[in-house]
UniProtKB/Swiss-Prot annotation:
Residues 134-144, 237-253 have a biased composition (Polar residues). Residues 1-33, 101-265 are annotated as: Disordered. A metal cation binds at C50, C53. This is Heavy metal-associated isoprenylated plant protein 35. Residues 39-102 form the HMA domain. Residues 1-12, 111-122, 154-169, 180-198 have a biased composition (Basic and acidic residues). GO terms for molecular function: metal ion binding. It holds the Pfam family HMA. Keywords: Lipoprotein, Metal-binding, Methylation, Prenylation. Residues 362-364 form a propeptide. Heavy-metal-binding protein. SUPFAM superfamilies: HMA, heavy metal-associated domain (SSF55008).
Amino acid sequence: MATDEMKSETKKTEHKQKQSTQIKQDLPPPTIPPLPLPYKSCTLKVSIHCEGCKRKVKKILTSIEGVFKVDIDVKQHKVTVIGIISPEILLKKLNKAGKNAEQLPEIPDPVDNKPKPVDPKEKNKKKKKEEKVQITNEATSSGIDNPEKPGSGECDKPESEKPVDEKCLSGDGGETSGPVKEEKKDVLKEKDSGKEESPSPPADSSAPAAEKKAEDTGGAVPDNGKVGKKKKKKGQSLATTNNPTDGPARTQSLPPPTATDYDRPINQINDHHITTTNNPPRHDLYPYPAQGYYAPQVMYGVSYNVAQPPVSVDAASYYTPPPPYSYAYMHNGYQPSDQNPCQPRPSDSFELFSDENPNGCAIM
């Protein structure tokens, strides 16, 4: 019985194999898909006025080998050609047929120009790469800018890690740094003491400026309280400059010059100023004549004669009076020095209007 069952099973399997082989033979062989042709589309601008022009252009383009399809737009004068051919050949054929044609620039498809979506994984990878590059650049730059000095690592270690016998914490270092600090302190003290001892320059310059103005204008020095106070405060400095001897220093303000001081030279106006000047002596605009001499004044007079009238009415006789007497002139002021020959101005104006003075006013 067992042998019969085994025989039946083997027969069934053989039958199944035969059926499968028959099915395979009945199926058609697999077909290979054709390769896509390299078609190109180009747009041309052609002058098309009517349906006849349209037919003529289409006939010319379809007759060329490699042209697959031709589309014509009459309103826009536009022709699109699809095929395996260069646009230069198409333009030559149309120009020979008498049709003006130009090639238009290709408009890119919006679908092709869309940006591709970027995966977040790629973004993370790029960021990590950039961070690594920055870290390496910083490390290289810090190594170049701050090179390690020999022996600096030992001093930079914390106190717990440093050995006891290091030079950074030894007593020798304290001895070397001690005198340097002391020298700096001495220099700072000298600078502070120099600032305290130095007098203020604007206060000293105010007094000579006022005296220079008085000398230039020829007037009296204004008796201001401010100038006097400043001079009193700076009495020691004036005593050292104006009094070369060991005598007492003058701290009082200078009195204003009088009228007689103008005739004296600059060296004698004030006893406080001993310095000599090389400037020429000062003269008045109208110098006075020498003492005891008066220039004769020319007198103008008209002679009127009734018996014998003059030839011309405008004729006039001119005569000069005799030289006047010399009058002694006394002046209580200082005698003029040899350096200034000019005479002082008369203090009293009574003599100018006296009858004895020929230079006086005749009306008075």
